[in-house]
């Protein structure tokens, strides 16, 4: 399409301005999981909102009326870090981060109807979170987690004497994981009890470490483990937790077990699904997750993968009897989806599970005794499910969800019935005003081997008779997806409202479309996925007349960053006006510097020294590829990214500069694989969007679009003969 035609069309669109800006995106309220009270009348959830003027993020807790959808403020005390229902009417337990014990937290008891009238039940001498409660006689037993010292005590950073040397000494892996160097402390689940004295509960300060007696065990497992890694039985007597297999090398294998242990720690925890154990189905030795007790406390449901070094293998539901030596039962094992979380119905007959299907996080139900060929039934709801809880003892669940068009969707869902909307953020928050599902639609295109899904995200005020440049966004993983959910980092709506039509493809390797598509990227990073992307681009060029591919851009992070680097040296790289590579691999042999070796050893069919040819096969730095580089490229890489060393980004930038390709490096010394700090996020958006807008022509047609000059961070340029005028 001729640039002049696009320019006229864009000028017509430019008069609408920018509907959803990075400032709106970053400052919009962020709400967490809504958890209902035992009777299903109210739900409590956290909320925070970044303020660009004061440079802080005030936080608090709200109450959601489950009948009316009305929201009221429970507390604006930012020191309240956690709230959970006590299990008695509207009574609450909350954690206060300020305490008389330096570095510790306080446990407080209150009532949702009069939150200010609270009393302190006790102190915990260290950071502690993830409370789960269960009645046990006249006590309330609880579990939660914090960090443990090697002796098994709760770690308190404020009480630790600073060492005189900064040296670290390692005899095994991990050395560093995700964004931090591994130290001697580790996560552990602790148990305790609240004792009732008259009308009040008190805590005696005694905690039992349930994990430390198992040498080399850790739960929740970092970097993303949380309260979903453990559970407390409804009778309060037994605790289940997930840990990586203590006897196996954690950086090389994904194998993990579900352990059970008495709440009082009177016995050492034992695994119920140990590799090659009598209770473990034959051949099952992968990652375990999401242990949850049945209502009668007699069974545990959990998820487990089969393969021992593959983090994206298909999860299968298992059910084991507590205290029995019988083998665990596999439930609906032929279902070609990968469940992510489980809950039991109040009668124990039905399982509610979440799983991704066709780029949407859905809720499903199935009998707890379902046979292998049973296909779970989907429950109707909007958007994607991020969490859910039962409303009282009914079959209805309160869903906390989100979508591409709203960052918070609270709704009631009941199997066999339409969902009932309670609160949708895009209908209330001024920052999200105008966002909705009408600007988003799926696209299916014949790919390299099968039909491939993409999302089309259109700008606010979209007019099908006008033309918009293409923003081609490639997701990470590679075993991931662009789902119908809200991203707090790469948000397609922010890109679209600069004046683009966003195409967000789910090529080979993506999750939620059957395990085969996910598996097919193994040892084929630059093969089928690249062909899929090229075919999608061609389909958009030939069939979507409102998309200008001549002035399009492409961007990606993580695996998407690798793919951008790969595209730069391929034919598709010449189809774009600008590229953005965020934390992408560049040199094939550099992958050995990553943290989780099981990832590369699975995806490249062997170790770095035994299958070197596979690592070199998709090496973006090969001279024959670099010789083709010419498309302007922004490189983003941060210092705390230990998945992919910052040297990858610097090396990529070095070559771009020496090749004379218009390029810029954006580095954050205090960020990791993702840029999460609000002010850094704003700079990221100003640089990334400013970069693509400059080369796509948006800056010329729409004066309100972001420019590189909008960023107030000074550019470092020591080259007197700089060839490129920014």
Swiss-Prot record:
A single Gene Ontology CC annotation of this entry is: extracellular region
Phylogenetic classification of the source organism? Eukaryota, Fungi, Dikarya, Ascomycota, Pezizomycotina
Pfam families to which the protein is assigned, alphabetical: PD40, Peptidase_S9
- Positions of glycan attachment: 96, 252, 485, 605, 699
Q: What class of enzyme is it?
A: hydrolase
Q: Could you tell me where this protein is found in the cell?
A: Secreted
Endpoints of the signal sequence: 1-19
Q: By what name is this protein known?
A: Dipeptidyl-peptidase 5
Keywords from UniProt, A to Z, are:
Aminopeptidase, Glycoprotein, Hydrolase, Protease, Secreted, Serine protease, Signal, Virulence
Task: State which Enzyme Commission number(s) the record gives.
Answer: 3.4.14.-
